[in-house]
Amino acid sequence: MHYIPLGDTALRVSRLCLGCMTFGEPDRGRHAWTLPEESSRPLIQHAIEGGINFFDTANSYSDGSSEEIVGRALRDFARRDEVVVATKVYHQVGDLAEGLSRAQILRSIDDSLRRLGMDYVDLLQIHRWDYSTPIEETLEALDEVVKAGKARYIGASSMHARQFAQALALQQQNGWARFVTMHDHYNLIYREEENEMLPLCQRNGVAVIPWSPLARGRLTRPWGETTARLVSDEFGKSLYSTSEENDAQISGNLADVAEELDASRAQVALAWLLSKPGVAAPIIGPSRQEQLDDLLQAVDLTLSPEQIDKLEAPYQPHPVVGFK
């Protein structure tokens, strides 16, 4: 495993981040495919043994049970100072309504720390933009969380670049804790972030930690081949259903490059992301140890300029999806 500074912070993270949406009690969330605790723990332990030290969860994943499972596993398999733990606030959890008001943020971080069994998180991210709360209230509350020692740093997730620029400017003007990461939707078949968000992040020293780096499994198998999870994944369908013809050509080129390198499609798709300036750690979501073992090899894979061009050439602009 290789490690990199997380933007302009003192944190050093593995080049792959373990996404923890996969972990959660199936009867407590919206996704029947999540792994219960007895299946999650071996995978988390295997990730640690493979060199991953960066874990991304959220208050809302499986109604909080993801944080509970991840927290217990990390306490058992690693020292607190050996791991970088990220969680999120915004979506509804139990009787805590959706939103980013001061009251919601302060309650959410306390609830997350209780579920995780930790005194602090390394990174607290806002999961989406809250149109019902003044952004100044949100940013000042996040600063309060950092000053209280409950989060070392703060980050943001999918939003318009103009919104992120506004937030960064307000943080600088008011001396508030600044966003150090952008958790955005970015992969070989969705590259709209390259237009504005990625350049903005590079100018401001913000680390990019992409979600859905394998397009929710679409970049791991022949185009059109399906799985039970793909069939039931309504959110995934909303992300990719309008661009399948163009995406199929990219998938075909991905298969060609993978064959040239004697690598898996997933390894090549991740290696492409890792080659992008500003990308710190794509967030992967394996559900089996053999999948994780395959993905871990991506950090040692180097693509030639010709291979990168072959992967990128077919891309055409896509509708902006994943947030409002």
Task: Name each model-derived stretch.
Residues 114-131:
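Active-site groove signature of glycoside hydrolases
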Residues 33-47, 100-116, 164-169:
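Short, acidic/polar
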Residues 24-38, 92-103, 132:
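Active-site mouth loops of central-metabolism enzymes
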Residues 1-83:
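N-terminal binding-site loop/beta-alpha segment at the start of enzyme catalytic domains
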Residues 14-15, 80-83, 87, 119-123, ...:
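Short acidic capping loops at alpha-helix termini that bridge into adjacent secondary structure
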Residues 73-81, 114-117, 146, 168-174:
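Acidic (Asp/Glu)-rich catalytic clusters
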Residues 21-23, 58-60, 88-92, 126-129, ...:
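Active-site beta-loop-alpha junctions enriched in small/polar residues
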Residues 133-313, 323:
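Beta/alpha (TIM)-barrel catalytic core signal, keyed to glycine-rich beta->alpha loops juxtaposed to Asp/Glu
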